Regions:
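Conserved helicase ATPase core of P-loop NTP-dependent helicases/translocases
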Residues: 9-12, 16-49
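Residues at the C-termini of beta-strands that transition into short coil/loop
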Residues: 22-25, 65, 95
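Active-site-adjacent loop/helix micro-motif of nuclease/hydrolase catalytic cores
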Residues: 28-32, 53, 68-74
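A short beta-strand element within the Helicase C-terminal
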Residues: 53-66, 89-93
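Short amphipathic alpha-helical segments
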Residues: 11-13, 53-58, 74-75, 105-106
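A conserved SF2-helicase RecA2
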Residues: 68-125
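Short, well-ordered beta-strand core segments
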Residues: 42, 61-62, 80
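Conserved RecA-like ASCE P-loop NTPase motor core of nucleic-acid helicases/translocases
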Residues: 1-4
């Protein structure tokens, strides 16, 4: 999962994505193909991948950057943890030490949005 176009541009240079979900478009396998799909990479823009798609053919989830919205975060995770997922799901989060990303993931883990007030507190204001 990624947030920004610049992330997508960087990722697509190093990852051979088999499927994509971004903006208003997606190319993902049909439900009938889920059983035969393995070792495939799907790049998903967090906001685009939140609702209405099923990604349970994936059991490895990587967040390249966090969203500030708990709802978007939970929806994104829910794409892999769907009915029909028969494999253990592993989630990785890229977090740069001593950055705001640590605070964002702390809020998300506490089931909260990362807010402007939290951001200002991080800045010492």
């Amino acid at each position: 999962f990624y947030n920004f176009q610049s992330e997508y541009d960087a990722l697509i240079e190093v990852i051979n994505a088999d499927y994509e979900v971004r903006g208003g478009s997606s190319n993902i396998p049909s439900k009938e193909e889920f059983e035969t799909v393995s070792n495939r990479t799907t790049l998903v823009q967090i906001q685009a991948g939140g609702t209405g798609i099923e990604l349970q053919y994936n059991n490895l989830v990587v967040f390249f950057s966090p969203t500030w919205s708990y709802q978007d975060y939970e929806q994104a995770l829910g794409r892999a943890y769907r009915n029909g997922q028969d494999k253990k799901v592993t989630v990785f989060k890229f977090v740069t030490k001593d950055t705001i990303e640590e605070d964002v993931y702390e809020a998300l883990t506490s089931k909260k949005d990362f807010t402007k007030d939290m951001f200002l507190k991080r800045l010492g204001g």
